[in-house]
Curated annotation (Swiss-Prot):
Any Gene Ontology CC annotation: NuA4 histone acetyltransferase complex
Stated name of the protein: Chromatin modification-related protein EAF6
Superkingdom assignment: Eukaryota
Keywords assigned: Chromatin regulator, Coiled coil, DNA damage, DNA repair, Nucleus, Transcription, Transcription regulation
Protein function: Component of the NuA4 histone acetyltransferase complex which is involved in transcriptional activation of selected genes principally by acetylation of nucleosomal histone H4 and H2A. The NuA4 complex is also involved in DNA repair.
Amino acid sequence: MSTKDTNDVKPTSSKSNEISSSGTATPKKTSSVPAKEDRKDTTKKDIANERTSSSKSKDDSEKYVELKNKLIQQILKKQELTRKLTTLEDSIYQKEIDYFEESPLGNIVKGFENFSKTSGGGGANKRKIVYSEDDHIFSLSSVNYIKSLMKRQGHTSNGGSSKDDFDDYEDSVDPTTASAGSKANSIEKNETPSGSSGTPSRKRKARVLED
């Protein structure tokens, strides 16, 4: 055999190794393990995502605390205004009582019929002047007073029973979360009357005057 014929002969050992004893070809196995560079890039992305999520959670927590403190201050302010309003309404109610008692001969609410009877024959001309809640015309101009009057009569603004009246629920704050917690508690005590269901403690007896 010449040198040329020897060079033309191709090795077939590798191909024969891929053929099994049964005569079927065995497929080549490919590696599924990612390269080191790919694993490194994936790790960096995971770390970046974790940092972004942690930063967002921290911002949300700070915003929640800020809104909570702001709400506490607003509730305390509302309670203080409610206390002042209740004190003012009590003062108006008492002034109406004083006016009724100081005008036995008549007033702008009941009229002035007794003026014509002052020179008459004594007891025959006397009559009793009875005042009711409807005579408190100034107090009736207050929305809060009307609500308290409806509650005393067994009615509520939403048409349901007294237990369904959600206006009775007072705003409150946890004293441990606010520096003014003790102040809030004192305000709630002033707003809550004794022996009544959320209404100011006022005298409700009918007043009788004689001329």
